[in-house]
Swiss-Prot record:
SUPFAM superfamilies attached to this UniProt entry: ALDH-like
Organism of derivation: Streptococcus pyogenes serotype M1
Catalytic function, reaction form: L-glutamate 5-semialdehyde + phosphate + NADP(+) = L-glutamyl 5-phosphate + NADPH + H(+)
Gene, per the UniProt record: proA
Protein name per its UniProtKB record: Gamma-glutamyl phosphate reductase
Family matches, as CDD domains: ALDH_F18-19_ProA-GPR
Lineage of the organism: Bacteria, Bacillati, Bacillota, Bacilli, Lactobacillales
Length: 416
């Protein structure tokens, strides 16, 4: 028996042991964990420093280092996310509907756990805690497989969670970490149909594509963030400037950062110089512009076809000038990763049309795409942002980690 199968068996058994846990027990434990994270900050930072040192040795960019880095403030924010999950209403056992049918059977449809969730993710160590807290609150066991660049951080975080579970009299196998970073073991997890009820990949395009191709277990696809901002003919250009700067430069390495800028030709000649001047005072950006946009910049390079479909995760942005709202919507729907999209406009009808017709999990009017986040949406720490339409879409909070079951009660009923 392989290590992966042993781990899967333990997770399956743990899912049965934690299935009956009450809301009170779960919330009390999550509050305990939130405190333990803060109390153990120095240990967690020391482990993270090992990952940062390894990343530096391998020439990882500053932007990607930021995804990997833990700080005291970030650990405090992770702990706050755990506490927020504790404070949320428990969906498990929630009655979705109840009725008596024509045969006199009493039928209830309730929310129940999924069972065992597997999570494959990349650099960010906070995902370990975020994913566990949501899985635990919904009575699911979870198997975590992080990237090798965050292995020391993930080991320290999962060790803390397991120790906290054990101290609380709860099976520590409710969370398990796959420490082997090999692709072979990852593929074994993707195909563990005997143990894994659902797999959630969270990372870049290559990871998502690999999971889609290799997985035999059900997958909830979380998306790459090829995110666009459309500046409409009726846009307030001051607001547009502020939003583009925020969405592109605040944290370019995250999936809700903007990667593409689409501008109506009626405002392009005014807006582009205005934006370029303002953004250069904050953080210069490399503009990859189409033929109409290129001469309007002081500094830009001609866009290649692949630039319009790339999640840069860097201070780089593609630029497209369009002649109508319809062309903007068509362009965005061609290149979107179905994550988050935004329109800047004072035209209410244009805003409504954009929100109705753009195919994305979150569609904004006059706001930065950086708000697409489970914590911001009031869902607690998110397990990922789903870009598919089946089961869950957008930031996935507690309900996304549940299924439903029908409970039918009779009194000797038989079907004639």
């Amino acid at each position: 028996m392989t290590d992966m199968r042993r781990l899967g068996q333990r997770a399956k058994q743990a899912s049965l042991l934690i299935a009956p846990l009450s809301t009170q027990i779960k919330n009390r434990f999550l509050s305990t964990l939130a405190k333990a994270l803060v109390d153990d900050t120095q240990t967690l930072l020391a482990a993270n420093q090992k990952d940062l040192a390894n990343a530096k040795e391998h020439g990882i960019s500053d932007i990607m280092m930021d995804r990997l880095r833990l700080t005291s403030e970030r650990i405090k924010a992770i702990a706050q996310g755990v506490q927020q999950v504790a404070d949320l209403a428990d969906p498990i056992g929630q009655v979705i509907k109840g009725y008596t049918n024509l045969d006199g059977l009493k039928i209830l449809q309730k929310r129940v756990p999924l069972g065992v969730i597997a999570m494959i993710f990349e650099s960010r160590p906070n995902v370990s805690v975020d994913a566990f807290s949501l899985a635990f609150k919904t009575n699911n066991a979870i198997i975590l497989r992080g990237g090798k660049d965050a292995l020391h951080s993930n080991k320290a975080l999962v060790k803390l969670i397991r120790q906290s579970l054990e101290k609380s009299g709860i099976t520590p196998d409710a969370v398990q970490l796959v420490e082997d970073p090999s692709h072979a073991v990852a593929e074994e997890l993707m195909q563990a149909t005997d143990y894994v009820d659902v797999l959630i990949p969270r990372g870049g395009a290559k990871l998502i594509q690999t999971v889609k191709e290799k997985a035999k277990v059900p997958v909830i696809e979380t998306g790459v963030g090829n995110v666009h901002i459309y500046v409409d003919a009726q846009a307030d250009l001051d607001i547009a400037t502020k939003i583009v700067i925020n969405a592109k430069t605040k944290r370019p390495s995250v999936c809700n950062a903007a990667e593409g800028l689409v501008i109506h030709e009626a405002v392009a000649a005014r807006f582009i110089p205005m934006l370029e001047k303002a953004i250069n005072q904050v953080q210069p950006v490399e503009w990859r512009a189409d033929d109409k946009a290129l001469p309007l910049f002081e500094q830009a390079v001609p866009a290649k076809a692949e630039d319009f479909e790339t999640e840069f995760l860097d201070y780089i942005m593609s630029v497209k000038v369009v002649s109508s709202l319809e062309e903007a919507i068509s362009w965005i729907n061609q290149y979107t990763s179905h994550h988050s999209e935004a329109i800047i406009t004072r035209d209410i009808k244009a805003a409504e049309t954009f929100q109705d017709l753009v195919d994305a999990a979150a569609v904004y009017v006059n706001a930065s795409t950086r708000f697409t986040d489970g914590f911001v949406f009031g869902l607690g720490a998110e397990i990922g942002i789903s870009t598919q339409k089946m089961h869950a879409r957008g930031p996935m909070g507690l309900e996304a980690l549940t299924s439903t079951k029908f409970y039918i009660n009779g009194d000797g009923h038989i079907r004639e």
